[in-house]
Amino acid sequence: MAKPDEIGFNPLEELDRSEARVVVRLEFRRFRKPVTTIQGLPSGRLAEIARELKRRFGAGGTIKGGEVLLQGDHRGHLKEELIKLGFSTDHIDMI
């Protein structure tokens, strides 16, 4: 898997640590399909982070309203992947 320096960014460099609050939650959309939503990611790198998470999970997804939406329930492994991307464990909330 790619390391943070291989994909060319460290999200915490762009944000103050007190403001780098990432919220992960599971929602059910059309036809009760699960969607994992991720809020609080740096907007300048949103597309790059979304692309990397979709690749790592082998899932479809999109960016909508400043959130990353991943098809399926990925809460079990998402925290580990966000930590690998450089986010602090203290600033990741799983709802």
Predicted feature descriptions by range:
Residues 1-51, 55-56, 62-64, 76, ...:
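Long, charged, low-complexity intrinsically disordered regions
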Residues 66-71:
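A generic structural motif
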